């Protein structure tokens, strides 16, 4: 059975275009995979704490020397990673905020990037350990940035996902959403065409 993991990272709980379009893509993937299991990870509703000394300390303390608090922190990270590893297809709703990703998504990445667990260092360089996944990134943007130097979001996402082993990444852009009604309609129509083709 196919498992689809949808990760919503918008800072708004209602009306975020990246979430709405990610919902549409997940529904389309369900139609293409009858019986698929869908898991939704809402990074706003289930917020993760930003990295701090206690979190980093837990990650870098050997298992046999962790405190109860550190074990709880690592268990949370392990659960997020297990959820990711169990998915066959991953849909990420990723709005562009100030040329990058939301702090919610960055924090999620910080909680799943663990040496020896989701990547490892070898004599030939780092190797990602989350392999065999198809990833769709649905990004919503107020302006038009794709293919320009101002799009630091796309290369960052491709780099991070590739670093942990997810190299089959498809980007769906909804750009120009704040450039007026006509531009918004065109952006959403273009994104929906890409969703239909995914």
From Swiss-Prot:
Keyword Flavoprotein: yes
InterPro entries: Flavodoxin_fold, Flavoprotein-like_sf, FMN-dep_NADH:Q_OxRdtase_AzoR1, NADH:quinone_OxRdtase_FMN_depd
Annotated residues for binding of FMN: 96-99
EC code: 1.6.5.-, 1.7.1.17
Cofactor stoichiometry and binding remark: Binds 1 FMN per subunit.
Top-level taxon of origin: Bacteria
UniProtKB keywords: Flavoprotein, FMN, NAD, Oxidoreductase
Cofactors demanded by this protein: FMN
GO molecular function annotation: electron transfer activity; FMN binding; oxidoreductase activity, acting on NAD(P)H as acceptor; oxidoreductase activity, acting on NAD(P)H, quinone or similar compound as acceptor
Catalytic reaction(s) noted: 2 a quinone + NADH + H(+) = 2 a 1,4-benzosemiquinone + NAD(+); N,N-dimethyl-1,4-phenylenediamine + anthranilate + 2 NAD(+) = 2-(4-dimethylaminophenyl)diazenylbenzoate + 2 NADH + 2 H(+)
Protein's job: Quinone reductase that provides resistance to thiol-specific stress caused by electrophilic quinones. Also exhibits azoreductase activity. Catalyzes the reductive cleavage of the azo bond in aromatic azo compounds to the corresponding amines.
Protein's name according to its UniProt entry: FMN-dependent NADH:quinone oxidoreductase 6
Encoding gene per record: azoR6
